[in-house]
Amino acid sequence: MLTFARQQQRRNVRWLLSLSLLVLLATLLSLCAGEQWIAPGDWLSARGELFVWQIRLPRTLAVLLVGAALALSGAVMQALFENPLAEPGLLGVSNGAGVGLIAAVLLGQGQLPGWALGLCAIAGALIITLILLRFARRHLSTSRLLLAGVALGIICSALMTWAIYFSTSFDLRQLMYWMMGGFGGVDWQQSWLMIALIPVLIWICCQSQPLNMLALGETSARQLGLPLWLWRNLLVIATGWMVGVSVAMAGAIGFIGLVIPHILRLCGLTDHRVLLPGCALAGAIALLLADVVARLALASAELPIGVVTATLGAPVFIWLLLKSAR
């Protein structure tokens, strides 16, 4: 038994080291790749000063943090709701952030600064989160809380559809691009959003013990002494914050929160002590590679990153499911 535990521990360490190395390589690729390839040796030149330090570095950092946040949100929600299909959009938090952002675009007539749009997106996500907490205070079961989140998401989606229908052509283009996701407008002015993500990401990665208990089910978690109501509220708030900030920076991006935790579980990483940091690293890698593809796929334009993640990720996910079923 001790030998098996040591082997498992070594395997987990190898996984985390491998993912960390891949994050470094993907970051290097993201900083070098673009309309002009800039090798690391040229980063201190005048051209590197503009393209790498002023344009690509803030974008790369934003992609890293958003990828980690979305993957961690998916892992937390799948443990919290005991549902492998749970992901950040399922509770309606992503759509709530979308409603806040769309309301700011329409009411501000495109004149609001980027920081104001970001605050509105975060406010929308937190409003949906507070509504969910109101349901949670009634001691609803996890399944009913999940259904409440789905219903809120449908309502927010309907509001966004109405807003797009009544918007002007300029607003419509801006809203449609946001709904497909993208990092094209990220620069150092959004650094406050990046900083807002970091403490919550670190805190979530340290919560392996309660999440391991929650993954066993509500009854088992109570028997083990976990204050279920408290932890459910804390995790829902943390998830709402991460999703709201991510939507404010990059718009709606699917696939990452659903598939990354699932893929790691299929690879044998079931303990949240390893799964949480693994999700943060793997989510960052996946979104970095998708962002590079979005930038380089077309010579004259940039693809929406949400389209890239769905197109590349869905076949890989199906293949892994079929492989695990054999």
From Swiss-Prot:
Transmembrane residue ranges: 17-39, 59-81, 88-107, 111-133, 146-168, 188-205, 242-264, 274-296, 303-322
First-listed, main subcellular location of the protein, grouped into a coarse class: membrane
Gene Ontology MF terms in the entry: vitamin transmembrane transporter activity
SUPFAM superfamilies reported for this sequence: ABC transporter involved in vitamin B12 uptake, BtuC
GO biological process, one term: cobalamin transport
GO CC, alphabetical: plasma membrane
UniProt keywords, alphabetically: Cell inner membrane, Cell membrane, Membrane, Transmembrane, Transmembrane helix, Transport
Membrane topology: Multi-pass membrane protein
InterPro entries per the UniProt record, alphabetical: ABC_BtuC-like, ABC_transptr_BtuC, ABC_transptr_permease_BtuC
Gene3D superfamilies reported in the protein's UniProt record: ABC transporter involved in vitamin B12 uptake, BtuC (1.10.3470.10)
Subcellular location, record wording: Cell inner membrane
Role summary: Part of the ABC transporter complex BtuCDF involved in vitamin B12 import. Involved in the translocation of the substrate across the membrane.
Family (UniProt): Belongs to the binding-protein-dependent transport system permease family. FecCD subfamily.
Subunit structure as annotated in this protein's UniProt entry: The complex is composed of two ATP-binding proteins (BtuD), two transmembrane proteins (BtuC) and a solute-binding protein (BtuF).
Name of this chain's protein: Vitamin B12 import system permease protein BtuC
Organism (species): Salmonella typhi
The organism's taxonomic lineage, starting at the top: Bacteria, Pseudomonadati, Pseudomonadota, Gammaproteobacteria, Enterobacterales
